[in-house]
């Protein structure tokens, strides 16, 4: 079930990326040309950064905490902690360490609910009508190799991130497209939530089965 949900979500994400490329890179619905009321701008115009609210926790601090809310690093969940800083839908973009994939695209995490990020990922929401979902698609299709600094420890600074050139559509186009993709991302969130519950159930039941505390030998399966 979990593997199936992961595969479905991967497919849903790819569908959304194809739609974004068709609209905002290939300009398919607009006869292959960028409409006159759109413009080339920079990332600074369309994002809000929440990095100042981040707070890293040491391994020792986390060891003493109850494991409730995800603690995010640059690329993934690193641990679970007993409190949270953010509650909602956000985009995490790797700031240092593993910041790009082998092709130069940024490492992204589409996160929702209550969570605590460390200081290795930028915490982003949208401006000018851009939803987090649209930003996720935009950055998924934007090569950022040229703004990465550092030879040993790679880094995408706030300043450099803000300079990335992007197509900024009209508010009407943004709204219309966002209405198309929101059902896709609602399903992605639903399936991820279902997987989280399945994982919790497995983690709770497995030790009991292994220890013999839970006996299923009499179940008619």
PLM feature segments, named:
Residues 1-56, 61-73, 167, 171-216:
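Non-catalytic DNA-recognition/assembly elements of restriction-modification systems
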Residues 34-35, 39-169, 220-221:
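DNA target-recognition domains and sequence-specific DNA-contacting regions of bacterial/archaeal
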């Amino acid at each position: 079930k979990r593997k199936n949900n992961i595969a479905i979500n991967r497919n849903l994400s790819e569908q959304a990326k194809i739609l974004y490329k068709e609209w905002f890179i290939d300009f398919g619905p607009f006869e292959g040309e960028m409409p006159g009321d759109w413009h080339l701008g920079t990332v600074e115009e369309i994002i809000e950064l929440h990095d100042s609210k981040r707070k890293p926790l040491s391994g020792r601090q986390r060891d003493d905490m109850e494991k409730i809310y995800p603690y995010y690093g640059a690329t993934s969940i690193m641990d679970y902690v007993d409190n949270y800083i953010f509650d909602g839908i956000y985009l995490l973009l790797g700031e240092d360490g593993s910041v790009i994939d082998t092709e130069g695209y940024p490492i992204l995490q589409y996160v929702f609910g209550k969570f605590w990020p460390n200081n290795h990922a930028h915490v982003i929401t949208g401006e000018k009508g851009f939803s987090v979902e649209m930003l996720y698609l935009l950055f998924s299709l934007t090569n950022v190799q040229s703004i990465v600094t550092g030879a040993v420890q790679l880094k995408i600074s706030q300043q450099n991130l803000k300079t990335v050139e992007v197509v900024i559509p009209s508010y009407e186009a943004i709204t219309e497209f966002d209405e198309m993709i929101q059902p896709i991302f609602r399903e992605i969130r639903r399936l991820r939530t279902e997987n989280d519950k399945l994982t919790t159930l497995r983690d709770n039941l497995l030790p009991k089965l292994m220890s013999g505390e839970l006996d299923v030998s009499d179940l008619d399966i």
